[in-house]
């Protein structure tokens, strides 16, 4: 809970509510929810994503039957690193999506809502690629080997992060009522 509180500036009640919600919705099916939250919350926060969106991506990944929620979070971590590294391979990947790499690097370096908007622009552009080989090549260039491991299953999960919202307070109240 402390990693959620620190990285997303939320209360203990909100953090525990999100943990309860995630567990109730299948995100702990492999027993790695708490480790995943601790390890990757800073990466999601750096992209301007909320704690709700972080948990939503994990629940969506579990719902989609992806191998492990850790892989979903690790793909976002790899993206966060590559989206800021200024490397030729990242620049080429952004260009392959029809995005201006200099603007994308600047947006991710800025963080917050600017990074969040750039993240969703990237995911949307990747989702629109019709050529599966090109989509995989660019996906791996930006999200690392986790993209390859999760294949096309990760794209709907990443695309749904934007609208993910889980009522952690309601989940915590249900636990308290028992």
What is the meaning of each model-derived region?
Residues 2-5, 9-178:
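Amphipathic/coiled-coil alpha-helical interface segments used
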């Amino acid at each position: 809970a402390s990693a959620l509180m620190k990285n997303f500036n939320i209360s203990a009640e909100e953090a525990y509510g999100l943990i309860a919600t995630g567990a109730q919705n299948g995100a702990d099916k492999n027993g790695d929810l708490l480790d995943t939250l601790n390890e990757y919350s800073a990466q999601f926060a750096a992209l301007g994503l909320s704690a709700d969106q972080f948990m939503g991506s994990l629940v969506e990944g579990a719902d989609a039957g992806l191998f492990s929620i850790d892989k979903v979070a690790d793909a976002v971590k790899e993206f966060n690193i590559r989206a800021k590294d200024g490397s030729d391979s990242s620049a080429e990947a952004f260009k392959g999506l029809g995005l201006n790499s200099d603007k994308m690097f600047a947006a991710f370096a800025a963080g917050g809502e600017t990074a969040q908007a750039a993240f969703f622009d990237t995911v949307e552009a990747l989702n629109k690629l019709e050529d599966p080989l090109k989509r995989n090549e660019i996906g791996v260039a930006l999200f690392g080997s986790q993209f390859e491991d999760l294949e096309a299953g990760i794209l709907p999960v990443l695309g749904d992060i934007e609208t993910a919202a889980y009522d952690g307070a309601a989940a915590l109240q249900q636990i308290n009522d028992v």
